[in-house]
Amino acid sequence: MYFVGLVKFKKLQTKDVVAENLRRIKAEEAKEGIKVHGIYWTLGSYDSVAIFEAPDEKIAMKMAIRRAEDMDMKTLVAVPMEEAMKLLE
């Protein structure tokens, strides 16, 4: 399943904070089957957007809960356009 995470940072983002968060995410990827397709810092209502795959909603939720100390994350389920188009048939 694909997910989009809309992130607001709670802490000042330093190189050390970012490096530690990336280390944790990579460990989760290996352990829980999460695959991060991209992390982008953004301007506007959210500080960052993450696009990732997880085996199911529960694993995606666990990832968001683990990050709760450092960031607020709204997680959206994303359906690839090709799959959504099939629903129109």
Regions found by a protein language model. Name each.
Residues 4-7, 40-64:
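Short, well-ordered beta-strand segments in beta-rich or mixed alpha/beta enzyme
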Residues 36-39, 73-75:
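Generic structural signal for residues in well-ordered beta-strands
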